[in-house]
Amino acid sequence: MNQEINNFYIKDQEIFDQIKLEEKRQKESINLIASENFVSQDVLKVQGTILTNKYAEGYPEKRFYNGCQYIDEIEKIAIERATELFKAKYANVQPHSGSQANMAVFQALLNPNDRILGLSLSDGGHLTHGSKMNFSGKYYESYFYGLNSKTETIDYAEVEKIAFAIRPKLIITGYSSYSKIIDFKSFRKIANKVNAYLMADIAHISGLVASGLHPCPLEAQADVVTSTTHKTLRGPRGGLILTNNKEIINKINKAVFPGGQGGPLMHIIAAKAVAFKEALHSDFIKYQKQILKNACFFAENLQKKGYRIISKSTENHLFLVDVKSKNPNFTGKKISDILNKVNIVVNKNVIPFDKETPLITSGIRLGTPAMTTRGFKENEFAKVSDFIDEAITNHNDLNYLNNLKQKVITLSKNFPLKI
């Protein structure tokens, strides 16, 4: 892995030791968490610069602090690159996270207790799309659409039926564990019929959208698009808001600052700008294409080994596996813990119509972006499929698992990070 920290040292030995251990873990693991990735050396370096010293409340040329002339240029570059990448008219690059980007949209477009409609959390939605545990469900009246019980995909006729029944002010699309292409145009038609705003949260698929490998919600006339800047976009941890509507961007800018945040994280915004430039390169499209190839191949391979893939296949970077299809006594928690013992890192995940709790689950979520960054192609994912099946089949044999772990470490070390 090129992201070595051998030349990095801090006096705080306790923290330094943990950083070194985490570096070792990343080097020696196969990371299949769909929301994680490995940033480039440039993105990593920029986050550790003196830009972290500068407070810059406000927006370029409208700051509340002096000394922002270079900071202004950095933020303007980030905005220009974001709008070019996603073919948008306006962008706000200040949100600290995807959740805060979503919160800003809610503040900008809604009043407390307005109705919102999103995919249920148990079917692949996100906490910020109306969960009662989250601000989106506490301060707004949230309703949900689900997936078709037979196809495990979105039933657009059912979404329309619910929308007519509740008349939401905001309809939300974009998900955290949905493996099919999203028909943004159908959502736009539904939103028009009930006079609702349409928000697309593309946090997971933003890299695919930017590369033209997934439909763009702005082309389908979504009112606003939110995203994280990590995941498939392969930038720093952070948020992003896009729109083609000047009135909406003015409201969003006020909702981000002063509505929800104070000073922006300029070292992160600079890293976002670097990541956007990387994503504008033709190599990024090749990378996204390989993500898709790997995901489709990976899902098919596990299917051949007897694992049920939710909705039968994937059309993006991730998919869900029903682990009970292999053994009714299995749970997502149990399988994710077993795989962790052999350095294969996944997350447990609820599946549609799951009877297990979110802390236990009947499924696991698998994604290909991180290991595709490391250089994995179909041959490597064939080996990963074998490793997963072997670990699950021999989960009670500690000697077998220890030997398998060494194979995983060897494969992982053969693909150091090269960007």
From Swiss-Prot:
GO terms for molecular function: glycine hydroxymethyltransferase activity; pyridoxal phosphate binding. (6S)-5,6,7,8-tetrahydrofolate binds at L121, G125, H126, L127. It comes from the Bacteria. The record marks H230 as: Plays an important role in substrate specificity. It is found in: Cytoplasm. GO terms for cellular component: cytosol. Its cofactor is pyridoxal 5'-phosphate. The keyword Membrane does not apply. Its main location: cytoplasm. Catalyzes the reversible interconversion of serine and glycine with tetrahydrofolate (THF) serving as the one-carbon carrier. This reaction serves as the major source of one-carbon groups required for the biosynthesis of purines, thymidylate, methionine, and other important biomolecules. Also exhibits THF-independent aldolase activity toward beta-hydroxyamino acids, producing glycine and aldehydes, via a retro-aldol mechanism. Belongs to the SHMT family. This is Serine hydroxymethyltransferase. The lineage of its organism: Bacteria, Bacillati, Mycoplasmatota, Mollicutes, Acholeplasmatales. The gene is glyA.
